[in-house]
């Protein structure tokens, strides 16, 4: 009786990802069908989490040689320091780890100084290298040192100002979120004879530090984690007699589900949308068939081939007796063999 509260609700049967011109930055993500009202509930929750709660990297302060405060001007530099600081705020950075990290920029004029002129180490990337920071006249030069931290949301410059900060260290407003824009819409859809269902469409733009698909996945995981505390019961478990284990004509590892392979979000969703549930379904696909799957590219193919190779399997295999009858029941019974 208790389980009917959630088991009998309509759940999305697939997640469709429609990539934009730059798949690393733009995507439309469609989920459905949903119970009436759940499109608005999930869409609003995911949007708020996407914009406020995902971790990212940002510059928190800058030191410019010869500059004591942000209301100064620099000889040979056309922009005031205030304008330079505003431009620095827009630099998008991808950085693993927590920081802080130091980055240096040195440039001689004439010409434009861009974010791509920042000297980075191997684990830090500037995602918008064409962003103009300032313009130097003939004979002018500039040296800047940036401090980069990781965090979430928006942090005002005043909160980035350390009490023991040296003179000339200018704090900067930090926008950590890798998500730039999120919008959603809810439309009516149907499943069979049920006409009163929702379809949720999310449009997500990131700065390139995360793909939109991964950003939505992380937001959903955050929401799931926050809701766990409200579940104050354990579901009753049915105790059944252990059935005899039949002999199989194939490796029982093929009964393992592909969502247990720890693939990337994109690869896992491509397999799900192509109705590939078990490893036995996957290995019978050829490379050509996989590459014809929507949104499935060479990178995903190589990832799957590597995972299968670790299990002694490969694409294009023939499996006698596949799929077996009662495959879901068999998968549970052979779980101990994986």
From Swiss-Prot:
**SUPFAM superfamilies (UniProt xref):** C-terminal domain of RNA polymerase alpha subunit (SSF47789), Insert subdomain of RNA polymerase alpha subunit (SSF56553), RBP11-like subunits of RNA polymerase (SSF55257)
Name the EC number(s).
2.7.7.6
The question of whether Glycoprotein is a record keyword is answered with no
Domain of life, source organism: Bacteria
Can you quote a single GO CC term?
cytoplasm
Gene Ontology MF annotations: DNA binding; DNA-directed RNA polymerase activity; protein dimerization activity
Task: List the keywords (alphabetical).
Answer: DNA-directed RNA polymerase, Nucleotidyltransferase, Transcription, Transferase
- Which Pfam families does UniProt cross-reference here? RNA_pol_A_bac, RNA_pol_A_CTD, RNA_pol_L
> Per the record, what are the reactions this protein catalyses?
RNA(n) + a ribonucleoside 5'-triphosphate = RNA(n+1) + diphosphate
A single GO BP term for this record reads: DNA-templated transcription
Quick one: where's region Alpha C-terminal domain (alpha-CTD)?
250-338
Complex formation: Homodimer. The RNAP catalytic core consists of 2 alpha, 1 beta, 1 beta' and 1 omega subunit. When a sigma factor is associated with the core the holoenzyme is formed, which can initiate transcription.
Function description: DNA-dependent RNA polymerase catalyzes the transcription of DNA into RNA using the four ribonucleoside triphosphates as substrates.
Quote the record's domain comment. The N-terminal domain is essential for RNAP assembly and basal transcription, whereas the C-terminal domain is involved in interaction with transcriptional regulators and with upstream promoter elements.
Family affiliation? Belongs to the RNA polymerase alpha chain family.
Question: What is the protein named?
Answer: DNA-directed RNA polymerase subunit alpha
Q: Which organism is it from?
A: Methylocella silvestris (strain DSM 15510 / CIP 108128 / LMG 27833 / NCIMB 13906 / BL2)
Give the gene name: rpoA
